């Protein structure tokens, strides 16, 4: 049998298996990404996925980028190994169209080419859960949320004094240490988390063994909280990420150079937030203030300096009446960025004052309606109004069967980098997205979503031969994204076996000119089988199939289109307690040593193994 035929045959077997005896009651999941307040995942019409700390540990994910690429509707491409430049596409849309948050603090870096977050620099050691809300969310969050929101929630302290320590070692001389210690009583909470992850790596550019491109990531997170009384509480949150990465640049002939032993970059990102909460009966007030400071320096044939600062303030008023909720929010954002290339500095900045109103109505015990409206007043761009209308219906005649739909509008303001390199005397304007999704799901067993999104006034770039730099501008025309997501989980609790799978098909991922976007796979299949014992041992096998995917080969003139897809990766996982409060995790990745290039010309991880010993107290 053809190997790809065998792999694709897993789709019907894993996606559509049903067994009425396999009904398992799961613990409720609480999220904050849908409307900025805590709620059950059942209390929103939005399409939400949650990756838990348990799943991260079981799969051995080292970064957020690695964790989300196994979610339906999301694809990720890496330009090399750990810490190398990474792009992620939610439903085919660009990285800068997804808002990334850490405990509510904005991580999107305005100094990047799209205003995107560096998911490759977000390690998983301190994560409690990752919330992913797909579809336009600008009617709540404003800019950079037209594809969705990824909110990373870090660990919270338990009662008394608790902590953990973990050490990792693996292929490519990868080593890591992470630790946390926390305290909690009736009034005070404190949690300090720190991690270091290093690797000697492999060549970012093919061939993989040309030389080593290393990476170092240092992360510290501090959370403090004080509860004055049952109604009033204050929280402080600080996060810092410092990285150093070696990469491969271009030679004198403008070709990728796998033997480049000079090009490197470092970054220093600091986020600080203060939150005050007041709650009495059915009313809650949230005050939020945060700052983000982003510094990046790239050293290759020239020196590039990137600087950005974000100041954000918000006030939320939440009113609960019965099973319904109304939220009135006010926001103020100040975004400022500088881009310097060989001593030539350019600037981009703007102010945004926003107001939004969100309502959830439980019409009866089976039908939920959610409406959002937001208005943003800019000092630099044309003001924007966005909205969302959603409905979800539970079918009592078939318990566990839910249908729903959402229609939304969204926008993405230019990043400070895009503003800095725009055409002279030309004012960029935000891109505008509108779209809808329709979904049906039956318990865990089957979840089907169809989506259709269109973006106008997208950003594009031309190369200026005089300055050897890109110029950003708005384009006329409409980009189109249509696709289907199918996912399923099937449990055999008596045997301790869990089957999971998801499949994504993109019908359209077209640019404004009708051509297809590069680096998006038309088909993606993720499948896994996991086995659990009563002694908390876990072992599993995981596979990912990437279908047709295209990229460009710039090694000759004119550049030509190349195929980079049609391959399957297999991974093995093992987790078990080895002593009291001590666990061992072993993860074997790409076990058949498949050679592939997610980004044409760049290498990918070969057969590799990693082990982690963790202790908690």
Predicted segments with their positions:
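Periplasmic-side early beta-strands and strand-to-turn transitions of outer-membrane beta-barrels
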Residues: 139, 151, 158-160, 168, ...
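Structural signature of Gram-negative outer-membrane beta-barrels, strongest in the C-terminal barrel
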Residues: 227-231, 239, 323, 327, ...
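N-terminal periplasmic "start-of-domain" segments of outer-membrane beta-barrel proteins
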Residues: 28-57
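Gram-negative outer-membrane beta-barrel transporters
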Residues: 360-369, 475-555, 580-584, 592, ...
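Short acidic/polar hinge/loop motifs at secondary-structure boundaries
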Residues: 106-134
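N-terminal periplasmic accessory domains that precede
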Residues: 64-67, 86-89, 98-101, 117-122, ...
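Outer-membrane beta-barrel signature, preferentially recognizing the C-terminal barrel domain
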Residues: 23, 254-279, 306-309, 395-398, ...
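Outer-membrane beta-barrel "beta-signal"
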Residues: 439-441, 605-617
